A protein has these predicted regions:
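Assembly/oligomerization interface modules of large self-assembling protein complexes
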Residues: 51-136
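Extended oligomerization regions of viral-like shell subunits
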Residues: 201-309
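Long, contiguous amphipathic alpha-helices that act as assembly "spine/axial" helices in icosahedral shell
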Residues: 119-189, 322-324
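Alpha-helix initiation and N-capping motif
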Residues: 51-52, 177, 203
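Short glycine-rich, low-complexity/disordered patches
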Residues: 71-79, 170-176, 180-186, 224-230
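Hydrophobic, Leu/Ile/Phe/Ala-enriched alpha-helical segments that form helix-helix packing faces
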Residues: 62, 164, 168, 214-217
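Extended, compositionally biased alpha-helical segments that mediate assembly or anchoring
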Residues: 1-65, 69, 73, 263-344
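Catalytic cofactor-binding cores of redox enzymes
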Residues: 181-204
């Protein structure tokens, strides 16, 4: 998706850093105007302590606060659940509907009042499985050149965003898609055969199949979740997904061939309501067979564990090393409906 292009580097940004800086920084660095960037930069470049304070504020506060202007928007980010800052495992429990028993008014039936009937419970555990770090180095020459003009300072900021934040966001997108691809490859995700919609007839056929699957999701069933495929033991798990809990991840070329109006009609939703449940992606695997994935929103168990900046100044080389650490859990739930539509 496109990103906003308003510049970040500005006198307002420099003064925001100054406002939160130490007294020594404020005494040495003048207020910024549109025409005095060099005067602002001179004391920052002259003293390591000033440079450290400036870069720390730039990376940790300014860029982190307003980086959305420069960020690529991950369309799959809506699948993320609440952060889990404690522990490395997350448990999800599923309780099957109780089994009906015939009424028995005899003494035998009355005796059963003290009998224990345990609920049919199954549990899945999701473990922390991503611990990435993204490095960027800013050397003295880069910092010096950044104070030549506002455009040069903007380029420095963009480099930080690209190296740290955008790299992380792009990887989050790839990891989420890979959940689906790996599950299909490993035989852990149910699939149905669908036709590639490349004309009016096949488009209608795809729409009917998608609508039928969506309606079937709303009924209690064990047919469309992946509990047994993912190694679950014991009884099948009965679940259902109301329309408002469903989403579709669909390839861009497939969505373009059908059109949003047709797809929204498949779900019996308005244009705007359907768009809120549609996620368009570039591909769903190298084999090119997966056209779309219809899923309950709870299928995707993606949780942020940690986002942290660390820094190190190398006085010998006169450069600053920054790392963005990103720890997450990426998993698919076995308990909720999820089916991939694939060509033969």
């Amino acid at each position: 998706m496109a990103t906003k292009n308003n510049p970040i580097a500005s006198p307002e940004m420099m003064n925001a850093i100054r406002n939160d800086a130490s007294d020594a920084y404020k005494a040495a660095v003048p207020l910024a105007t549109a025409s005095n960037l060099a005067d602002v930069g001179n004391p920052i470049l002259a003293y390591d302590a000033m440079a450290n304070e400036f870069l720390s504020a730039l990376v940790n506060k300014i860029v982190a606060t307003i980086l959305y202007r420069k960020m690529w928007n991950n369309p799959l980010s809506m699948l993320r659940k609440n952060a889990e800052p404690l522990g490395v495992d997350v448990e999800e429990a599923h309780v099957n509907p109780a089994t009906a028993q015939a009424y028995d008014g005899t003494e035998t039936g009355m005796a059963a009042v003290l009998k224990m009937t345990k609920p049919d419970v199954a549990a899945a555990w999701y473990r922390l499985n991503r611990q990435d770090k993204y490095p960027v180095t800013i050397n003295n020459e880069q910092l010096t050149n950044a104070f030549v003009s506002w455009n040069a300072l903007e380029n420095l900021i963009q480099g930080i965003v690209d190296s740290l934040y955008n790299a992380n966001t792009i990887d989050e997108f790839k990891y989420t898609k890979q959940l689906v691809v790996d599950a299909i490859t490993d035989g852990k995700l149910k699939t149905v055969t669908a036709v590639m919609p490349n004309n009016e007839a096949t488009g209608k056929q795809f729409q009917v199949q998608l609508r039928n699957m969506s309606m079937l999701f709303t009924f209690p069933s064990s047919t469309y979740n992946n509990y047994k495929l993912m190694g679950g033991t014991g009884n099948d798990r009965v679940t259902w997904s109301p329309i408002e809990d469903q989403l579709i991840i669909i390839r861009a070329d497939v969505a373009a061939n059908i059109g949003v109006e047709v797809l929204s009609a498949a779900f019996n939703l308005s244009y705007s309501d359907y768009l809120a449940r549609q996620i368009i992606v570039d591909d769903l695997g190298a084999d090119g067979k997966t056209l779309a994935v219809l899923a309950d929103t709870k299928t995707f168990q993606i949780r942020e564990k940690l986002r942290r900046f660390t820094t190190f100044y190398n006085g010998s080389a006169m450069n600053w090393n920054y790392w963005l650490h990103a720890w997450d859990t990426f998993s698919l739930s076995p308990f909720h409906n999820c089916v991939a539509l694939r060509t033969a």
